[in-house]
């Protein structure tokens, strides 16, 4: 018998992707490498230094492009090259010297992106990983777009975890932060197969049992994995004694026949959780994790 998501959450089920960033969309954008390379060289860029691509989504925004471009050019102490590609403002941030891993690190640039672009212009951004070869700008552009697309899912997860940098994600997200969601969904293009995976995941059964029995095993299991198997941290988060956390976990292992001692199972379970999260509305997720 195929299990379904608990009916209490049926209204919250949602389509996770709107198709804006499909492969066809990627192919429709022309990234003029030669032109960008020449412009960067004139600006002081030295081949071999580190680069990050930041993509701001201007879709539907009444923004003066000259004004926002001028603001973006002040980022990273002026080591910033700005290019408009369709409805996106693409910003290349680069370091002064090679092997400089700190100047454009995530922590360094997020506050300036928030203060200089996000707050004044109300636009979101996605950030690529650091790279060196400018000819890889197309892949970095993809990473930044995916960061934009999966930002909301990551932000919801951080709110559940009550992470200190939750507000920081308001400005945007880095690809490194959203990659679990990218891997989950991009590897599951067969929707019938995804539905099968979701229906057969015992997390769905745990969630249904929680609703029926007014228990919180779903939350306990998520926090245990998210806190790297630290029962004390779970106890503090859920106002329980660590021994109670361990007791509930043991009961789950026995009832649903699994073992958290197996690393591969824990890794798979984290992906299953994110698959469930992506198929719940934000309201349903908030209800599920409210204390």
For each predicted feature, which ranges?
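Cytosolic nucleotide-utilizing catalytic cores of signal-transduction proteins
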Residues: 2-8, 17-291
